[in-house]
């Protein structure tokens, strides 16, 4: 029944992944050890998309946990939800990738990858009808970025016709862990463009801004950031996990969201974002939700969509809401801001409704947009990449692991191509497409 196998790689990927499983297991009425005490049929109906039932109402996540060092794994295993995961599905090395993409992709990671693929294969075999994979990782480190992208391409080889969705945390200038992040991120984007079907871009900088501005947290921890990411992941996947009409699996989401195969980098947002203590003091209405959801301050991707245009976007509302009210609101937003949507894709705003609200809220809305302004993210990384690469700074760490400078040049030009493709479609208008055939004919006649 339309299963999804989840992989989490590297420290960031594992922490985000753990938060995601915590969120969705409580939404489906599972306790910390995976025993089911669901109160409604809706919680049970599509449980097997993410969970495998192993007798007497115990459910185990279809999750594969990967890292090149044991630290994060030990933390998850000894954490509150450690007993949820299947012990054989923890695959880890002893060395660490040391924030070096080449180590994750070519040396250390390559030694571990066959072991991981075995576990993935076993998970896939226990599915009735596997729809695809999702992976949580960061693009700035060594394991999540290097080994994460290696896993994606290996899974692509083995399961060429299955969907591949990634939740990728991009490095941000304000919150930098290591100086080589621009290298790691560029090399990763180079891989994601080719091998992933949909990439949800999440940005630490935007998450920090939300925590400090909206949630009024003076010094947000990674726990707070991961809480935000898991909320948005739960919102995106709600249409896979609960009965609904629109975007009910990964492929349908991609069909609605990806007009050109390379342009599959989405920005995500969520509403209502209220600080933990203030939730109970206000009732949300659909107009308020919609307003908040289209507010650039609610985006978890640090680029301003007002600088670009939406090719497509999709909104998932959750809770007891009338479909008509949602449609009216979305229509009015679309009409008021029609300049922000390309006019050559009609009906490019999709809405879905799921009647099960997230824990602790009456209603919520999750936003996924394919906007041309996502090029700002890549631009930021590219500028930093170029500054270092011109001087060949830190390159010896990568060439020492057997990489070639050529690969950096290729990755850089692939990312530049991606940015110019976004730019081209941002500027395209309806009339562009119609003029070209005549222009070609005219040139042809002139030659004769």
Curated annotation (Swiss-Prot):
GTP binds at residues 11, 69, 138, 142-144, 204, 226. GO terms for molecular function: GTP binding; GTPase activity; metal ion binding; structural constituent of cytoskeleton. InterPro entries: Beta-tubulin_BS, Beta_tubulin, Tub_FtsZ_C, Tubulin, Tubulin/FtsZ-like_C, Tubulin/FtsZ_2-layer-sand-dom, Tubulin/FtsZ_GTPase_sf, Tubulin_C. CDD domains: beta_tubulin (cd02187). PROSITE patterns: TUBULIN, TUBULIN_B_AUTOREG. Its cofactor is Mg(2+). Gene3D superfamilies: Helix hairpin bin, Tubulin/FtsZ, C-terminal domain, Tubulin/FtsZ, GTPase domain. GO terms for biological process: microtubule cytoskeleton organization; mitotic cell cycle. GO terms for cellular component: cytoplasm; microtubule. The keyword rRNA-binding does not apply. It comes from the Eukaryota. Keywords: Cytoplasm, Cytoskeleton, GTP-binding, Magnesium, Metal-binding, Microtubule, Nucleotide-binding. Dimer of alpha and beta chains. A typical microtubule is a hollow water-filled tube with an outer diameter of 25 nm and an inner diameter of 15 nM. Alpha-beta heterodimers associate head-to-tail to form protofilaments running lengthwise along the microtubule wall with the beta-tubulin subunit facing the microtubule plus end conferring a structural polarity. Microtubules usually have 13 protofilaments but different protofilament numbers can be found in some organisms and specialized cells. Belongs to the tubulin family. Tubulin is the major constituent of microtubules, a cylinder consisting of laterally associated linear protofilaments composed of alpha- and beta-tubulin heterodimers. Microtubules grow by the addition of GTP-tubulin dimers to the microtubule end, where a stabilizing cap forms. Below the cap, tubulin dimers are in GDP-bound state, owing to GTPase activity of alpha-tubulin. This is Tubulin beta chain. It comes from Aspergillus fumigatus (strain ATCC MYA-4609 / CBS 101355 / FGSC A1100 / Af293).
